[in-house]
């Protein structure tokens, strides 16, 4: 009997669970190892060199778990580490791409707000993407230090208070399109829509998972409601706190 393909997913904490949820929508027979580096979260306010060391350490752990590929399910980790680690590891390393391209192409000439961590906002990867799209004048970059940490703590009331003035300001500027440049923020979609009802939200999860499955030659068939998922996953949260495992379970079952 053929062994299922084993894939590693990593994030600084809970954000990558939004990517895992996307992966579990497909009728694929995968074995997934998810590593949340909560002992060292959040990554978004650290130096890029420190993030690189942390991500390298997690990838070494996942390689010892005999995964065939690793997805950095974290925009900050991708910005700071993906390019370097692809040269160091013999297995494929995939990363996240903020959904700036579809947001710009689907809304020609219109402003697009990008919510992301300080590391993602200042790294060369993002500047290069904006330049390629000739979108430097259209993308409003908004750094959100501390917001991912509120998701890791499950403090959605504080997250809403944090976002309210940002969203009010965007509405005053007639911004209609919002890119979530951090996988943690995907869990804040309902809060965003409650405070900014007509905004169009873009995130990179769907495109990333399609690219991952295509690259690994895994059939892309969406599960229907009556099918059971054949993939299995293991959660490793290095905080080892019961609270985080409960929160992970809640986030994975959250309705979109």
From Swiss-Prot:
Chain sites annotated for binding substrate: 11-12, 43-44, 75-76, 183-184
Active site: 74 (proton donor/acceptor), 182 (proton donor/acceptor)
Reaction(s) catalysed by this chain's protein: L-glutamate = D-glutamate
Pfam name, any one: Asp_Glu_race
Keyword annotations of the record: Cell shape, Cell wall biogenesis/degradation, Isomerase, Peptidoglycan synthesis
Biological processes annotated in GO: cell wall organization; peptidoglycan biosynthetic process; regulation of cell shape
EC top class, as a word: isomerase
Enzyme Commission no: 5.1.1.3
InterPro entries linked: Asp/Glu/hydantoin_racemase, Asp/Glu_race, Glu_race
Pathway it works in: Cell wall biogenesis; peptidoglycan biosynthesis
GO MF annotations in UniProt: amino-acid racemase activity; glutamate racemase activity
Function: Provides the (R)-glutamate required for cell wall biosynthesis.
Family, similarity comment: Belongs to the aspartate/glutamate racemases family.
Name of the protein this chain belongs to: Glutamate racemase
Gene designation: murI
């Amino acid at each position: 009997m053929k062994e299922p393909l084993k894939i590693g997913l990593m994030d600084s904490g809970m954000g990558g669970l939004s990517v895992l949820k996307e992966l579990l929508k497909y009728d694929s027979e995968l074995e997934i190892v998810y590593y949340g580096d909560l002992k060292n979260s959040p990554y978004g306010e650290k130096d890029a060199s420190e993030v690189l060391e942390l991500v390298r350490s997690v990838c070494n752990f996942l390689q010892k778990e005999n995964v065939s590929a690793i997805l950095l399910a974290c925009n900050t980790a991708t910005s700071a580490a993906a390019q370097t680690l692809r040269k160091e590891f013999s297995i494929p390393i995939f990363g996240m791409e903020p959904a700036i391209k579809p947001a710009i192409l689907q809304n020609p000439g219109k402003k697009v707000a990008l919510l992301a961590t300080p590391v993602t906002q200042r790294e060369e990867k993002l500047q290069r993407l904006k330049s390629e799209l000739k979108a430097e004048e259209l993308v409003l970059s908004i750094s959100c230090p501390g917001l991912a940490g509120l998701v890791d703590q499950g403090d959605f009331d504080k997250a809403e208070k944090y976002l309210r003035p940002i969203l009010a300001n965007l509405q005053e500027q007639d911004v209609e399109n919002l890119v979530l440049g951090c996988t943690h923020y995907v869990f804040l979609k309902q809060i965003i829509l409650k405070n900014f009802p007509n905004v169009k939200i873009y995130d990179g999860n769907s495109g990333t998972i399609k690219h991952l499955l295509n690259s690994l030659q895994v059939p892309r068939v969406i599960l229907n409601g009556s099918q059971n998922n054949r993939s299995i996953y293991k959660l490793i949260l290095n905080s080892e706190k019961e609270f985080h495992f409960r929160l992970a379970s809640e986030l994975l079952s959250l309705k979109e």
